[in-house]
Amino acid sequence: MDASNKQPTLAEKFAAVWEKKNARAARAGGVSLMALSLAACGSDDDTVATTTAATTTATDTSTTTPVASSFDLTNGTDTLSGAGTFNAGMVWSPGGTDRIESLQSEDTVTGTGTADIINITNNGGAIAPKLIGVETVNFNVAGATAGTLNLSNSSGITTVALSSTDGDVGVSGVGTGVEVKVAGIADASTNAFANMTATAVLGSATAATVSVDGFVGTNINVGSSAAAGVSGAGVETLTLNSSGEVSSIASLGSSGATTINVNASQTTTVSAFTATGITTLDASGSTGSTTLNVAANVNANDFAYTGGSGTDTLIANSGFTGTDNLNGGDGADTFSIRVLSTSGDVTVGALSAASAAVVSNIETLDMRSLDNGGANAIDFTVDMDHMPGVTALSMRAGDTGTATVFNLNDMNATQAGAISLGFNGTGNTTGTDATVNLGLKDASGTADSATITITASIDDDATPASNQTALIQDSTTNNAIESLTVNLAGTKGIILSTEAATFGTSLTVTGGAADQSLTTGTTFNNTTVDMSAVASNITFTMGTLATQTVKTGSGADTINAAAGSKTIDLGANDDTLVTGTAGIGNAVANVDSFNGGDGADTLHVTGTFTDSGTVLGVVSNFETLRLDPAGTQAVTMSNFINNAGFTKIIVDDAGGGTITVNNASSSLNTLRLEDGVAGETVVFGRLVDTADNTLAIDSRTATATATALTINNEEIVNYSSNAAADDTTITTVTSADLTTLNISGAGDLLITNAIASSTKLKTVDASASTGGVEVHANNSAVAMTATGNSASAGVFEFTGGSAADTITG
């Protein structure tokens, strides 16, 4: 038969199909297709057989070192063997319509080298392939659906690396000696887990290792029964390695662990451990900063902690006992007590059986309370004798109903100089929110001090903290701390109080947020109160010390003075100084000094005072004088020998008496009538009576009737009411020089009697008034023009004089 017409035998047909299926794998393995075919099904071609034999002989005697290769899995059933890297990525389906996983449960991959790797991409779901001798398995979940790699059918694996873009990722069937790595998980809701076999966790000394790199997901669970939302079990010693990028683990779940080792070269946070029997937490191998929350383990167990060389924080929900050992290691380390809402009061401080400190190399003690939902807050008492290495104390109050009390006893000078207090964002409460009692170990000196920084913007519960109250007291015997410095931080206001008999030498306050308030719940009896570096709006009351100096800052401040010799500097902005009869000084011996500073400042006098240059000469740099004497008072403006810049007088309560303002300068051009003016007589006169004096009268009376107003030196009077409710009635107005009366605003102005002595009045203009106006100009001897508001419903009642007058409106 002609060779060209020869039909292929059955064996040849089988070989052709087999070759097509395995061609790629065969080429990757370095075996010729011809040799593979012949080895599979033989040949009746002597020439080929001879050639193949020769080729095989040459290959067998070669001394070339095998080179690791790369193998790609397909969309079919794969059985691959070789040394190198196996790629099990997403591939097209047989029909070419969908992307599917190339690694399936029926696939077998055998690594023949010593460092074989398989890279697996999973689109969700569980797979259980057979992986033999592949040392490193990289398993990545590419979608939102959780994916699990089951290694029950596999062996020879030393490392499993888990990663995910979204969905939970895990591995099951993990045997003894397998390190689990978790990396590149940036979704905060993603979990990772390593479910170990029952054989792997036999005994009481099972160890497991988890390495993280850039994990910022939720849980990492390790051990038998571990799943995305289930803690593992059966592991007694768990080692956590952290490197590369920052990692933050919400919960490290291995419930049976008694020893935790942390080796972190990068910043690492573990917010919770599911294990409740931890006796050893060893982070001495860490060089990066660690934050580890062991919750109740310190209180429940004899607990030993060793920190690393970074800035470490150990978090517990209780204090420590004499059988514990807390060593922060190198770096600036913190022991943070964050109690549960159901906890009782906390006592911090204990010594070992040998009366030695059980805490060392910890620089900051941090204490935080939560709202316990009851009538009493959780209080802290700490004996700093038992924490000699601590150089700073931090507190945070969180109860919404009752003040959290912090008793800081036996502090040394360094500790007393580095105290901080914050709030948990609980908003305004009816009582004091935090009370801090400061106690020094040695307060025998004459210049003992304490410094506390208060932050009013911490908001763990997402509610902005504002106007929280902090009461700072000296609990040292005989109140021996002479000076207190309070630094205000944050963006919210604060209410600051101190015990009346404490910090007698000085109180210094700095900081604060602009446009926020700094108020006080107590009088300040410190010899010096320095708030010159405060940006907030200050309101406080001075004490009755014989001598006191007060400085305020750049906010709009209101200071209430008291008896004694006071030196006051209100700094920048528009400030108000309120002082009574005793406050402004009534004797030559008084050495007060009231300096309004920059801005438009107000001196508010609430009592009667001696009208003399000796008394009023203590005032400088005020622009407004508010008279509220509750009785008859005369003030000669020229007696303000150091304050010629007054521009406004506010007349308030004179108890039905008379307020007389004499010798007003030309710059004093505004007279405000407050509602206390009812039943009073007000007299305003100039130091120099020029031909063009102008006075603005601003009414804020809320319906008041004044008995009389005398303004004899004013040619032009511009009257205005602040609001429709500011209705003013003046029984008698006397104004000898008055030529023009302009009336505006929504409130009524009713001048009951004819304006006395007003022979020169020629213009009454009420066109800008929307309230009722009543003016009787009977005494004018010149032709007048009177204008009402024609567009308003307000009543304009006018009486002209003896000349030819024009009335419109």
Regions found by a protein language model. Give the residues of each.
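Solvent-exposed, low-complexity segments and loops of surface/extracellular structural proteins
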Residues: 31-37, 41-809
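Bacterial Sec-dependent N-terminal signal peptides
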Residues: 1-33
